A protein has these predicted regions:
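Short alpha-helix boundary/capping motifs
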Residues: 1, 372-373, 472-473, 521-522, ...
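Basic- and hydrophobic-enriched, low-structure N-terminal and domain-boundary segments
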Residues: 1-173, 181-187, 510, 522, ...
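P-loop NTPase motor domains
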Residues: 22-26, 33, 147-449, 464, ...
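General secondary-structure edge motif
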Residues: 107, 138, 142, 150, ...
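A short glycine-/small-residue-rich loop at the edge of a beta-strand within enzyme catalytic domains
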Residues: 113-122, 393, 428, 484
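N-terminal short leaders/motifs
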Residues: 131-146, 322-336, 502-506
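Low-complexity, polar-biased intrinsically disordered regions enriched in Pro/Ser/Thr/Gly
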Residues: 135-142, 253-264, 504-525
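Conserved ATP-driven motor cores of ASCE-family P-loop NTPases powering translocation/secretion/packaging/pilus
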Residues: 441-546
Length: 587
């Protein structure tokens, strides 16, 4: 029966009930009260008179009597039952989550009690968010935290598309929160922060200074303000030499050409760069051990001329891995050497920029102090452009140098740092490929190094670490999804959340008339379903975030923004880069 026919029949039956029931109610009332069930007193045309009398229908709707109330109930039940039958489809289907049944999967979201137990007991760890919506961040607030001394490591991978509040709801709150954790403890934590656009420094520097932090800045935005750092000066072994060289080459912003598309060229350039850095370290005085001197050396006749190159390193008594790398370079034919030289010279052309020479010529800060006990903890901001990867190679070299130095410091202190060090690597794709990061992540916890790796998407990570991206993710016990735009990240997120079991219940109603003339038949079936489908991951509300952790069910929390644009919500006044001292111009 179609809806139109059913409606017509419904109206007809309702009209008949509204005619017949008032007459029946009136007859019953009269028989009871007036005629007292004596048929001899009933007029011959009593039924017709009752039917035609308007007072019959007026009394039905205005008088409260048992017979009227009974008839009203009949009409009401008819309306409810008829509407229920018409609005319900012939085949009703719905599904229920049945992870407790678990025939096809047991994944589910954490219950409110589990969330409280897992994230709200302690505040000594990364700040994650809240179980309450629409909150504004303030230091020390009640919220969800990844416990510092819990069973999971503190290595966290964060993914958020542009506009997903990565900075305001995650990075900024944690810069404020980390000093708060150690406020009343003997030890203090050091901070290493990569800062696109100088936003993080501007919004947090005064707060950090108020917490007795020594705030340092490496300015790769203007190449003008703050500190300078020469990564070559901190190289103390062959392994570090090669890590610096490999990181620099792999992170080059130069577009791939016919040669660099082949890994042979990048490896050859890395070997040559490592050899030249080793030469500078062994032969030049300390003040000349710089990247700009490496560039000068590369373009000198001693390197360019094939005959002079054969004896160049031996004439200066260069030894160790530097000599071996140089000999590897000499094995190539002259034409191949020329291409290697051109490729490396193109990548080192950065060091013809005066500002970059100034910022890498000397070191006004000592990264050997990071992780050690000292009077003031250190917060280092590495400012970098968010729309230009020109300086990615040298930024990569600096981050690589800092990580290597942290491991050396930990080794000198018995295996772990005296002061825990937090790495907040915002826009990590702009740093490039950090050598051996997948191996370091496996040992950072024991060294008391706690990294936060922030990406816009999984394809960014895969692009930078094509062979190791899954290793990097597996070393991070916590994955956060703040917002997803691309299919690859959505599919990965959906897959990592796991499968659950759903029950689909089908109800078949036979509705050939206005009232079902047969009892409903039901069937139940169990199926597998992703806890969240990829499209559902992409439709995550702007205010929400997904937490996926090893050994725990996933959960969805609310983001908590630091609303610095509202003066009443500011934790500190903004700082300005121009207030920092300018870097002296190199001679």
């Amino acid at each position: 029966m179609d809806n139109k026919a059913g409606l017509i029949i419904f109206i007809i039956i309702l009209a008949l009930l509204l005619i017949i029931l008032p007459v029946l109610s009136s007859i019953f009332t009269d028989f009871l009260n007036r005629y007292i069930f004596n048929l001899s007193l009933v007029p011959d045309n009593f039924l017709l008179l009752t039917f035609k009398n308007p007072q019959t229908y007026i009394n039905f709707f205005t008088r409260l009597s048992p017979s009227n109330m009974l008839c009203w109930g009949v009409i009401g039940l008819f309306i409810i039952y008829s509407l229920f039958g018409q609005l319900s489809s012939k085949n009703q289907k719905r599904y229920l989550r049945k992870d407790d049944y678990g025939s096809h999967g047991t994944s589910r979201f954490q219950s409110p009690r589990e969330i409280k137990n897992n994230y709200f007991k302690y505040n000594s760890g990364w700040f994650l968010g809240s179980d309450k919506p629409n909150l504004t961040y303030h230091v020390g607030m009640a919220g969800a935290y990844q416990p510092l001394h819990g069973n999971l490591n503190m290595q966290i991978a964060v993914f958020g598309s542009p506009g997903s509040y990565k900075t305001t709801a995650f990075v900024l709150p944690n810069i404020f929160h980390i000093p708060f954790i150690y406020k009343n403890t003997p030890e203090k934590a050091d901070l290493i922060i990569t800062d696109p656009k100088c936003e993080l420094y501007s919004l947090t520097a005064k707060y950090l200074k108020s917490q007795n932090y020594e705030v340092r800045v490496l300015d790769f935005l203007n190449l003008k303000y703050g500190d300078s750092l020469n990564p070559i000066s901190f190289i103390s072994g062959d392994k570090e030499l090669m890590e610096i060289a490999e990181g620099f080459i792999n992170s080059s912003s130069v577009s791939k050409n016919a040669y660099s598309a082949d890994p042979f060229w990048e490896k050859s350039e890395s070997q040559l760069l490592g050899a030249l850095i080793g030469f500078v370290k062994q032969v030049y005085p300390k003040y000349q051990q710089t990247f700009s001197e490496v560039l000068k050396l590369l373009t000198s006749q001693n390197v360019r001329d094939p005959q002079k190159a054969e004896v160049f390193f031996t004439d200066y008594c260069v030894k160790g891995s530097a000599l071996q790398l140089w000999n590897n370079y000499l094995l190539a034919e002259d034409k191949v050497r020329a291409n290697i030289l051109i490729g490396l010279a193109t990548k080192l052309k950065l060091f013809s920029i005066p500002g970059l020479i100034n910022i890498t010529e000397t070191s006004t800060m000592d990264i050997k102090k990071i992780g050690r006990k000292k009077d003031k903890p250190m917060a280092l901001f590495i400012l970098m452009p968010d729309n230009d990867k020109t300086f990615s190679p040298i930024i990569n070299s600096i981050v690589t140098s800092i990580l290597s130095q942290l491991y050396k410091t930990a080794a000198s202190l018995g295996g772990s740092l005296a002061s825990p060090t937090y790495l907040i690597l915002e826009e990590m794709a702009n740093i490039g490929n950090i050598p051996s990061i997948e191996m370091m992540l496996g040992t950072m916890r024991s060294r008391r190094i706690y990294p936060m790796l922030v990406w816009q998407s999984l394809p960014q990570l895969k692009n930078r670490y094509s062979d190791y991206w899954e290793d990097i993710l597996s070393m991070c016990d916590t994955h956060l999804y703040l917002g997803i735009n691309d299919d690859f990240t959505a599919n990965y997120c959906s897959s990592s959340l796991g499968d659950t079991t759903i029950k689909i219940q089908s109800t078949h109603n036979k509705t050939s008339s206005i009232l079902p003339d047969d009892s409903p038949s039901q069937s139940q079936n169990y199926y597998m379903r992703k806890l969240l489908l990829p499209d559902e991951c992409k439709r995550l509300p702007q205010s929400g975030l997904i937490i996926s952790q090893r050994s725990l069910f996933p959960s969805i929390l609310s983001k908590v923004q630091y609303k610095y644009w509202n003066k009443k919500d500011r934790i500190c006044a903004p700082s300005f880069l121009e207030d920092l001292p300018e870097i002296p111009i190199s001679n």
